[in-house]
Every structure is written in C-alpha cells, then in structure tokens.
Amino acid sequence: NFNDPLDYFDELKTFATTSSGTPKDQFHFTYGSLEWFNLSQGGVSAGYGADWAVISATPPREIVVAYTEPNSPAVAPGTDLARGAKVLEVDGFDINTNTQAGIDALNAALWPSSVGESHDFTVQDIDGTVRQITLTSEAITLAMVQNTRVINTPTGDIGYMMFNFFRAPAEEELVDAINLLNDGNGIDDLVLDIRYN
C-alpha cells in the first residue's frame, strides 16, 4: 500500500549496480510538478549552463563540456568554459574516485538540483591549461536553438543550426532561426544539428 506515488515509484526503481559500479537503472527519475512545468514550458532548470558529455562513466572517467548556454555562469568572465574542456576534480574529489561519497559528490556538483548551489571544479581547457573555477547554479533559461549561421562554401551556402530541445519555446526560436537563414539570398542546404537533443 502506497499513499504517495513517489514512494511507489521508488519501490519499483532498482538502485543496484553492475560489477563495474554503473547503476542498472540509469533512466528512471522524477521531477516535481512545478520543476517539470518550468522545464517543459519555459525551458528553465537549475544548472550552470554547461551541458556535460559523459564520454566514460567509469574510471578512467571522461566528462567534458559538450556545449554552453549563452549568458550563463558557465560562460561568465573568469569561468569561460568552452566545448571540450575536461573536468578533472569536483569539490576536492578526483573525477576517477570510486568511493560512494566521491561519486555522490560528483553527481551533486555536476547536476545541481536547486538554484544557489556552489561547487569547486578543476578543469582542463582544450589548450591544456588546468585551472580551478567555482560554479554557482542559477535558473538557466535553455536556448532551444543555438549557433545559427550561414557557412559559405564553393558549392553554395549552407545553413547551420543546433537544435537542442523539443519544448514549448522551441517553436519561436526555430522560426527566428529559419528567418535568419532566409535573409539575403537564402541557403542551398541546411544542417540541422540534433546530436544533443
């Protein structure tokens, strides 16, 4: 008997891990109603504005910046995270930690659950520079469409846009991007980059 649906959900979810330490159930989660509404209708969630790509989830771990959100803590002066920057340490824990406390710290820091959380990171930029930064989570308004531009080639003009989310605000951003690509002489081909969608 369950009075709360979340209790029932938690009972169904397994917290068991494989022999390598990877959770067996990597895909089940819940959002509170307000949090889900803000995310699905407004594209707003707590974070730093850095989308992490987990290249390897087990040691040797590799976690890098896939892309950043405009006007976010990730791209603020002094932080300046860019695509390809590697995470080396989080809150004093090496990225390859195997302790439960270390893994919990990595998860809490990389994916903050609320606004105002501060975490210390050691990162390695793509030029090899290793540096320490502190990131504080904010309510990040996600850009559904990014990097819209025209690339001139000898065979014609190619329109490019990165489309990240199928959420309510995406429609207007897609229309704006298409209008931008259509300005002038238009384009001959279109690249719709949905690899992070």
Which residues are covered by each model-predicted region?
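Flexible, low-complexity junctional segments that flank or bridge functional domains
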Residues: 1-196
